[in-house]
Amino acid sequence: MQTRFLLCLTSILFLGCVVIPSSVPADPNATPVVSEDFSKTSKVPQSFLVLNGEVTLAATNRNRFLALPAKPLATHGVMFGPAMRDGLRVAARFRGEQKGRQSPAFGVGLNGISGYRLRVNPARRKLELLRNEVRVHEADYQWVPGQWTHMMLQVRELPGLQWAIEAKVWNETQHIPAAWTLTWKDAEAPLAGRPSAWGTPYSGTPISLDDLQVWRID
């Protein structure tokens, strides 16, 4: 469920508040296809395909979200939205907990199971881009346990039979970045497939998943 986070800055001579918007701002070049915050449903939507394990609907503080199970230790998630080759953008937000030195890994994907996956890997302090389970690019990233992490991934065709894969990641206390956090070009045409969101519970605790969105992009 979309929320707004309020950061209050105080000092002896000043008291003020700064509102950090958590939702993705409207883009005139993007057409919404899927927008699911689970506020109007009591179960996983029928149009979603569950990947491994038992994904359930949970709620805290009047906010409903998907709970990716803590056991078994495997990759759990959902597929949703249309199956397309390019011209698609996906976004979601995740929240996980650290247990000792163990942290969950999670991310969003496009182009189906063997397509592109954007993964937050706290153990390596990296944001990773994978294609067909192979890491093709990465960037430094510091994950914050217990906070919602927002992720966005898009694939678009470029002139000359190339494809741009672009991603943004930010946490609940930050504004959405103006520039892409990670970019990569691919000369091999992607296959058509559905968007996805998933997580691996290395810390032995459930992973929260919310605000799943898909757009067609020009």
Give the ranges of each region predicted by the language model.
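Extracellular carbohydrate-recognition regions
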Residues: 24-50
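Short tryptophan-centered beta-strand motifs in secreted/extracellular beta-sheet-rich domains
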Residues: 38, 92, 147-158, 165-169
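Extracellular beta-strand elements of beta-rich domains used
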Residues: 38, 210-214
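Extracellular glycan-recognition surfaces and repeat-rich motifs
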Residues: 41-65
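Secretory/extracellular carbohydrate-interaction modules
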Residues: 61-62, 67-131
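Beta-strand-rich interaction surfaces with strong enrichment in secreted/lumenal proteins
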Residues: 76-82, 137-143, 198-199
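Short, aromatic/His-centered strand-loop micro-motif at the edge of beta-sheets
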Residues: 130-152
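Flexible glycan-contacting loops in extracellular carbohydrate-active proteins
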Residues: 176-208
